[in-house]
């Protein structure tokens, strides 16, 4: 009665075997015992009876039945064999009453190897079942590689989510998924949340693979994360399959990007171009049409030194390109719905948009996908998206010099440092400052506080309560603030005395980017790269600078200038030489320097910093929304905090 099913399954097996042989691949099931030593199997741990994804069942525990199945688990033996008769009997049982008894499997690196129940797996795979009940035993791999670290992250994720059917190819994504579905790190999932996520995952998987996702070297989980970053988790539930298909088509480059070993192409300096003629210097390619450029700020210049700096940059652009570019500022975008502010800017016929705060990254990305004719850039760092570009400055170069100034003035006293947010770029600034202080003062200690925890005044008070008078505070002063404490200051009974300050030349940054857009080199960069483009320019490009007070001793001013020239020429590298973390781990020894990618991805603090990365729950609302967008990777952040706590 069920012979026809067996014949069809056998044909699938024969086809798979031929395909594997033609490609030089092993055509049968993998055998766990062939690559896992017996002593490791003996030390395996019981997981219990769980539902496992059938697609992740890839082989057998022992070699007894290996050649009875092709690599796709379809049967190869003749239909007259006892094996075939048992297969067809199970086929009937499945169709009439269902196969309920759990199989027995060994799990290794999220793949399952059957100890008992191979034919049940074969039958259920033939009929397209998604999961199967299994009594599982887990064999843990040795740690040390990126692959195993991702695996251990999946185990941590499974503890509180009970989700075991999604996998990723990059570290940190399980905790990123936890955030994207609206859960706090470590927060347990309810049964309803698991059902809803399972439904969303398999709906997305069906559409994504039908669209061609199987051709990409990308896990379904990677693709789903990329989708959710643009459209959100809730929208995945509400959209029909046809709507999901349309959305996937719009962001296909976000999926192909996931195939890259390194997702981001850091542009460390502006493109070197031939000097244009007088007319083209202002407006390349002889364009006569006036361009409209929008600057969308999360706050207002009167309330935020950061926004005030970007507003000065906009005014610089307006002056330099007068008559050729018109700029418009949109303030307080985060006071309401920032997506509506972006839409209004587009309705106002702006074709180039700068969103000047990291927490507007998500809405900027969504707008860029929906409006491919509009050029959108977001002021943030280390974000992997093809449809927008990010820009930030290597402020750590200036902070290294300021740290050296502080170290030279501190003597035997500690120095204070107040940081805004634990985000990409700012961790490097903390460490560069501390290393600069240590370079001139080997015993220098830097006490770290956060303005995103109870505000700037509270952070300053915590330092002064320790008797610390030399403090590096916010980079930019709020023009309406009563106190103009910024940069490196000496706190006296009569008030702060400013000694040195970092300067962001946003006008130079915006002018250079706009020239690249107008002369088409901006588009050429996109076409020549398959990665996400992040601009990360430094002192040499003129986008950041150091101003020193005349109150500084002459020798200290000369030291600062010497270091500035060294950094601009590439001779002086802030992260060169032996580096050691707070927990004692040596990052590298003498004669080496961190790569730009390592600098950007810092989630650890050097050994002369006293303090920690703040806990998420301690942050202000603005701090949380900023960290949600561009915070250091949660997995490594949480791990580094735990390591530091355990070492104290």
Identify the role of each PLM range.
Residues 369-392:
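Flexible loop/hinge segments that line or gate small-molecule binding clefts
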Residues 314, 401-441, 532-551:
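An alpha-beta-alpha
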Residues 392-413, 503-524:
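Hydrophobic alpha-helical segments within soluble ligand-binding/sensing domains
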Residues 292-312, 317, 329-333, 425-427:
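Extracytoplasmic "Venus flytrap"
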Residues 282-306, 414-420:
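Short beta-strand segments enriched in small/hydrophobic residues
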